[in-house]
């Protein structure tokens, strides 16, 4: 399903447009990837699926991105710098809405399936930040530049706002809002891809 939606996005040019929009950031995190290469779109889609906690969607997208990175790899038996950076970002698991985990907790009879929302938000944000900084130091990538600093500022503001919101509402409302936001984002992405594919 998700690889099919990805194919629609590729054929319509949507993924390339999104990758171009984020290219100032992605090109600095992945300096060895040629500017405008389709793999940047695959990386973006994988990160988006991970942030929504859509494990089943993120896996095929991640495999596709890694396959494309391998095609760019000059040493086929050794992981390239972009592959290492992508793997670290992927496995650190930055999640905005942990849908799958909350569903599993609800299925197992947890009294408050959304209790883990803020701890997951904080831990995955910090793990991703530390991972990116560590790999950037090892690969001598300069993170002190305008696009990266703007992105980090926006992410910090967004996460601060989310945490503030969820600390000031009840657990029941937290579950309702989390599910609603995730479903709207998910549905919106699917509709956007279909509409761009139709045109």
Segment roles from a protein language model:
Residues 1, 103-199:
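Signature of multi-pass transmembrane helix bundles
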Residues 1-71, 199:
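Membrane-embedded alpha-helical segments and adjacent helix-loop junctions characteristic
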Residues 8-19, 82-85, 146-155:
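Alpha-helical transmembrane segments of integral membrane proteins, especially early/N-terminal helices
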Residues 9-13, 22, 73, 108, ...:
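Membrane-interfacial segments
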Residues 13, 17-21, 42, 60, ...:
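Conserved active-site and cofactor/substrate-binding residues in soluble primary-metabolism enzymes
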Residues 33-39, 70-88, 111-119:
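Membrane-interface alpha-helices at helix entry/exit sites of multi-pass transporters
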Residues 52, 84-98, 118-132:
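Membrane-embedded alpha-helical segments of transport systems
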Residues 55, 59-76, 101-114:
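Membrane-interfacial helix-loop connectors
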């Amino acid at each position: 399903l998700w690889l099919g939606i990805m194919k629609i996005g590729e054929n319509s040019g949507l993924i390339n447009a999104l990758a171009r929009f984020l290219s100032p950031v992605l090109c600095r995190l992945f300096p060895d990837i040629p500017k405008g290469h389709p793999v940047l779109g695959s990386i973006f889609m994988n990160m988006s699926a991970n942030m929504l906690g859509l494990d089943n969607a993120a896996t095929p997208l991640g495999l596709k991105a890694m396959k494309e990175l391998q095609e760019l790899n000059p040493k086929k038996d050794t992981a390239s710098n972009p592959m290492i950076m992508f793997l670290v970002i992927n496995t650190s698991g930055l999640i905005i809405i942990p849908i799958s985990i909350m569903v599993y907790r609800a299925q197992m009879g947890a009294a408050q399936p959304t209790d883990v929302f803020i701890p997951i938000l904080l831990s995955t944000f910090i793990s991703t930040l530390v991972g990116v900084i560590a790999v950037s130091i090892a690969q001598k990538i300069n993170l002190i530049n305008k696009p990266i600093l703007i992105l980090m500022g926006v992410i910090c503001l967004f996460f601060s706002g989310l945490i503030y919101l969820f600390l000031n509402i009840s657990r029941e409302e937290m579950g309702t809002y989390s599910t609603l936001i995730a479903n709207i984002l998910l549905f919106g992405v699917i509709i956007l891809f279909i509409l761009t594919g139709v045109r």
